[in-house]
Regions:
Chain A
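Positively charged n-region of N-terminal signal peptides that target proteins for export
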Residues: 1-4
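N-terminal leader/targeting segments and the immediate start of mature chains
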Residues: 19-40, 46-51, 197-201
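An acidic-aromatic
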Residues: 59-109, 179, 185
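Flexible, surface-exposed loop/linker segments and immediately adjacent secondary-structure boundaries
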Residues: 94-141
Length: 201, 789
């Protein structure tokens, strides 16, 4: 997951690109797109030059109109909150980092892309990526390729698959670093948000 | 008479030469007056490096027009910007639109990646010195596992501690402008904007450019507003200010100019029943102007706009010569030959010329080239105008050519009832009252040389400028630091020393940041220090890198390999290398490179709080080769020094003129000067009482006032007998014309013209009223003096 944020920031600092259409209406129809969606994630990273993969896990929430919460619980607890105008990184209650749109105008763009990625909003993603997809009765697969060369170089290739929700995200970077994220236990509606999570929004 | 014809013919030849030379200069050479106000500084104070830094910062900024086209959404903003651009493209060659280089986007980071160990932010450098190894290990682990810990560029092993990523982020924040879809993009809470940097092809101060650019920008903005809903167009540029100023000025020229022309025509008509006198007076002044331009160009090879404008106003005194002759012609017996009349007037005419020329030449003894040029310009102009009167007027105006109008008779009669100044109790009381009032006014007199107080831009322009400044967080082009050194390395090192001083000012919000080449290319010394610092604090055996390996279950081989990868030998990044890469494009203007024997650069300031200027002025004190530059302050100080020198020149001129008058008038010499001196004192007192700060333009007007006032004094003292109306008529006509031509400028809303005009208005009126009071008493029942017919 970190790759996505990092690469997006880096790339967005440099550029962004837009527009075209892909036959993705079927996939769009399969996606549930709830207002509130929370679940569990398991992330595995294979970094260039390292023998062992790095595993981490935690919870995530996507709230329409508000933003994204990404809570890593293991091995080091920390929380990331992305809203329209800022990105805040908490370690416990302490704010370890805050990036707001005033400082960095691309924050809004990053956050909207991330929100789209987690909720599977392909129409939105098309502004930055060439989207190629296929769908059958039980699920769908999509490959994203950044339209701008700089973004493509920074992010590499992104693949998503899922059904009513996004199930897997795979990112392969040009540098050789790879990241796999698996989503599970997805719940929707206001009740899906734990009290401590609701408090953070 | 024949002798005079020869004289007139000779003068006609000279005038033909003048016309030829001027035609050659303006049409052949196409000379353009200097406009840079710093060219008016004494030569030894001019500094080639400073000049070049100005041309990098200010001249470039003068030609720029920055336009932001914004809409609530990005697609709308792009449509509006396209519509805007299409209108601009319809007039090619006027405004050039900068093209965005797509290649520059993709390889933005490449030049830096090879040098990443030496590229650190100030905070990172402090942390490297102060923080324990556990801080760095924890930091790297958090970055490894957390979803987001700032930007990371390339593989983890390239930048395990996130130092390079942090540096890139800090660099990106030097400007909020981002490339997006092949355009430049900024945003605020309400709108997304496309930034259109435009460059004006013609000079910003040329009237043609202003007249063409403004309507074009207006049409473009209208097209943009039609292209999408909620569009906002914000524009700023020197040309917009210049255009606003000249449209205000030309509007005023129309009203004030027409008013004063109508007044002069009516006045002349009612006095002479003819318009010929105006034609003649204008002829003499015109020849004076052309003559001084020729002579100045031959002497100096250049003319400054300020010299031209001020010099031309000072030549205005020359109307007195023509008026004096014409009024005497009117009063004299029509049978009297004009050449003989002139012979009689010659001593007083000569004296007035000499007084004005000597007065103006006082300006030549100041160290400022602008004032010297002005002195030569106006003195030469007066001589030429005077010679025109002397050589041509007697032939052009014969006896009986002029008839006295009703106005002249009524006005002339008023002289007989005018009060006369006699030393006595009443006069002393009046003098004492005057002294008290004047003293009070003077005590409240202040000076203001701030160039900004000479401008009154429309509020719309000011608010656009503020919005633009906020959105772009751009540095000010007129206040910055100039850094010099023997080599580029020395310059970079001094920049770094300066930046250490500026950091606390950023923290104190005096500035929001600074732009410097050393932000991108640290000095070689700093780069070496940083590599050593990173190596010793992070990469050493048992240090954070080894501990990080342990924490994630990697062996010693991993740490060793990563260490070797990071420490791969790198030559330091050099300024020259950086400047040859695309990412340096926005920063190239900061680097002056080698100028003569030194290297120089600019450190520009963003988000300057003007209240903090005194702090900034001294921020670089004590660092060798660092100089604070404030062009606004510089120009203001030039104006201030000109004001002071000119003030002294006025005083010296009074002394010189008095010395000149002494041999002819002896005990009456003071009577010639007193009206002008009193009027000047009173005018300054009025300025003090009405809380108008003193400017260069007030003092300039006082100089002109001395020129005209002395003429009036001489005219009246030459024929003090009150039965002779000719001098009184000449004074009245000259003064009325001066008030109509210069004094009406007091109605102008352009501050410089207002200051000049108001001083002339009050001063001339007072001299006019006072001058008959000081004529010496004559035995008016005795014979008419020998000097009258």
């Amino acid at each position: 997951m970190k790759r996505i944020f990092s690469a997006l920031t880096a790339a967005a600092l440099l550029c962004a690109s837009a527009h075209a259409a892909a036959p993705i209406a079927r996939i769009q129809a399969m996606l549930a797109k709830p207002d509130v969606m929370c679940g569990r994630f398991d992330q595995t990273k294979h970094l260039a030059g390292m023998n062992k993969p790095l595993a981490s896990s935690g919870r995530f929430c996507v709230v329409a109109g508000k933003g994204v919460l990404w809570r890593t619980l293991k091995p080091f607890p920390n929380t990331l909150r992305l809203t329209r105008d800022e990105i805040v990184h908490f370690e416990g209650d302490r704010v370890a980092m805050r990036l707001d749109a005033k400082q960095e105008p691309t924050v809004r763009m990053i956050n909207s892309v991330l929100f789209s990625l987690l909720s599977g909003d392909l129409a939105q993603l098309e502004s930055l990526f060439e989207v190629e997809g296929s769908a059958d009765a039980v699920g769908w697969k999509v490959a994203l390729k950044a339209r701008a060369p700089a973004l493509a170089k920074a992010i590499g290739a992104i693949a998503l698959d899922g059904g009513a929700y996004v199930r897997n995200i795979h990112i392969g970077e040009a540098s050789g670093d790879r990241t796999d994220i698996v989503f599970a236990d997805i719940k929707t509606g206001e009740a899906a948000l734990l009290p401590e999570e609701a408090a953070l929004f | 008479m024949t002798g005079h014809k020869g004289l007139a013919l000779a003068w006609a030849m000279v005038v033909c030469l003048l016309l030829g030379h001027n035609a050659y200069l303006w049409l052949g050479q196409r000379i353009v007056p200097d406009t840079d106000i710093l060219a008016l500084l004494p030569v030894q104070e001019r500094d080639p490096v400073l000049q070049q830094s100005f041309s990098h910062m200010v001249d470039a900024a003068q030609q720029r027009v920055i336009v932001l086209v914004g809409a609530p959404d990005w697609a709308g903003a792009q449509r509006a910007a396209d519509a805007y651009g299409a209108v601009l493209a319809s007039r090619p060659g006027l405004l050039e639109q900068a093209k965005l280089d797509g290649q520059a986007e993709s390889d933005w980071l490449a030049p830096f990646q090879a040098h990443r160990l030496a590229l650190l932010t100030a905070q990172q450098e402090r942390d490297l010195r102060d923080q324990p190894p556990a801080f760095w290990t924890g930091n790297a682990l958090a970055r490894l596992y957390s979803a987001f810990a700032g930007p990371k560029l390339g593989a983890f092993r390239d930048d395990p501690f996130g130092l390079f990523g942090g540096w890139v982020q800090e660099r990106a924040q030097e400007t909020p402008v981002r490339p997006r879809d092949g355009r430049l993009f900024v945003a605020d809470a309400e709108r997304q904007y496309v930034l259109l940097p435009l460059t004006l092809a013609a000079p910003a101060f040329s009237m043609a450019a202003q007249e063409a650019v403004l309507p074009l920008l207006g049409r473009a903005a209208a097209a943009a507003r039609q292209a999408a809903p909620g569009v906002q167009v914000i524009s700023a540029g020197v040309v917009l200010h210049a255009a606003a100023a000249s449209s205000q000025a030309s509007g005023e020229v129309e009203t004030i100019g027409l008013g004063s022309l109508a007044g002069i025509v009516l006045l002349t008509w009612f006095t002479f029943h003819s318009l010929k006198p105006i034609g003649l007076v204008l002829l003499s002044i015109g020849i004076g102007f052309l003559g001084s331009l020729s002579v100045c160009w031959l002497l100096f090879g250049r003319v400054h706009l300020l010299t031209l404008v001020f010099g031309a106003s000072l030549i205005g005194v020359a109307q007195d010569y023509g008026m004096y002759f014409l009024c005497n012609r009117l009063a004299a017996d029509p049978a009297c030959d004009s050449a003989r009349l002139l012979k009689r007037l010659l001593p007083s005419l000569g004296l007035t010329l000499l007084a004005a020329v000597i007065g103006y030449l006082g300006l030549a003894f100041t160290p400022f080239p602008g004032l010297r040029h002005m002195a030569v310009f106006s003195a030469v102009g007066l001589v030429f105008a005077w010679l025109t009167v002397v050589c041509w007027f007697p032939l052009l105006v014969g006896g009986g050519a002029l008839r006295s109008g009703r106005l002249a008779r009524v006005y002339g009669a008023a002289l007989a009832r005018w009060p006369r100044f006699r030393i006595g109790r009443a006069a002393l009381a009046v003098l004492a009252a005057f002294a008290v009032l004047a003293g009070f006014g003077w005590s409240r007199l202040t000076a203001d040389d701030d160039i900004r107080s000479l401008q009154t831009p429309p509020p719309q322009l000011v608010s656009d400028q503020l919005k633009l400044g906020k959105l772009l967080d751009a540095p000010t082009p007129v206040q910055y630091f100039l850094v010099r050194g023997a080599s580029s390395e020395a310059v970079l090192q001094r920049e770094e020393a300066l930046k250490h001083r500026l950091d606390p000012l950023v923290a104190a919000r005096a500035i929001s940041g600074y732009q410097a080449l050393s932000n991108w290319v640290p000095s070689a010394r700093t780069q070496a220090e940083r590599r050593v610092l990173v190596e010793s604090r992070l990469l050493g055996e048992g240090g954070p890198l080894t501990q990080l390996g342990k924490a994630i279950g990697e062996d010693a081989a991993w740490s060793a390999a990563t260490r070797a990868h990071l420490l791969a030998p790198q030559a330091p990044l050099t300024a020259e290398e950086f400047l040859s890469t695309p990412p340096s494009e926005p920063w190239r203007h900061l680097w002056l490179g080698q100028v003569g024997s030194v290297h120089a650069s600019i450190v520009a300031l963003r988000g300057l709080d003007y209240a903090a200027l005194p702090l900034l002025r001294h921020a670089g004190d004590g660092i060798e080769g660092v100089q604070w530059v404030d062009k606004v302050g510089e120009i203001s100080s030039v104006l201030g020094r000109y004001r002071q020198y000119m003030g002294w020149a006025v005083l010296a001129a009074y002394a010189l003129v008095f010395a000149l008058l002494l041999p002819r008038y002896r005990g009456r010499a003071w009577r010639v000067l007193a009206p002008t001196a009193l009027a000047s004192i009173a005018t300054l007192a009025v300025l003090g009482l009405t809380a108008q700060p003193l400017q260069l333009f007030h003092v300039l007007a006082l100089m002109l006032l001395l020129g005209v006032g002395v003429d009036y004094g001489i005219f009246m003292q030459e024929q003090p007998d009150r039965r002779h109306a000719a001098p009184w008529l000449a004074v009245g006509l000259s003064a009325a014309n001066t008030i109509l031509s210069f004094g009406l400028l007091g109605l102008s809303r352009t501050p410089a013209l207002h200051a000049f005009g108001l001083t002339m208005l009050i001063g001339t009126a007072l001299v006019w009223l006072a001058v008959p009071c000081f004529t010496a008493e004559t035995n008016e029942s005795a014979h008419a003096p020998a000097t009258t017919d």
